[in-house]
């Protein structure tokens, strides 16, 4: 199973708004496409939003991620949640045990 850590630096003053929009728009669409959301957190000290998502299905991660970004539902999100993201980091992570 592939697990990805995503860390978004959010524009100042928009962290709570971003978290709400993520919960209402991004999370449901990711889950609909087959991703599993393992958790999400806000980091107020650094104005960041971190979340873990996984996928263990027949398609590749890249195929599913592309489907998310190209979906009509993603293009129809208003307001566009990406407007509040200043920086994106994402890493595939491996368990220690």
Regions found by a protein language model. Name each.
Residues 17-38, 54-91, 96-97:
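An amphipathic, aromatic/His-enriched active-site/gating alpha helix that lines ligand/cofactor pockets
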Residues 40-42:
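Trp/Gly-enriched beta-strand/coil motifs that build multi-repeat beta-propeller-like domains
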Residues 45-46:
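Short strand-connecting beta-turns/loops that link adjacent beta-strands
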Residues 2-7, 29-30, 49-52:
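Short, structured motif recognition centered on aromatic/hydrophobic residues
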């Amino acid at each position: 199973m592939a697990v990805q850590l995503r860390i978004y630096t959010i524009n100042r003053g928009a962290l709570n708004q971003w978290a709400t929009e993520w919960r209402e728009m991004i999370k449901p669409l990711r889950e609909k496409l087959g991703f599993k959301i393992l958790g999400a957190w806000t980091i107020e000290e650094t104005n960041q939003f971190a979340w873990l998502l996984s996928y263990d299905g027949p398609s590749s991660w890249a195929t599913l991620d592309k489907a998310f970004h190209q979906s009509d539902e993603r293009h129809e999100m208003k307001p566009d949640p990406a407007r509040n993201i200043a920086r994106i980091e994402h890493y595939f992570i491996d368990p220690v045990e």
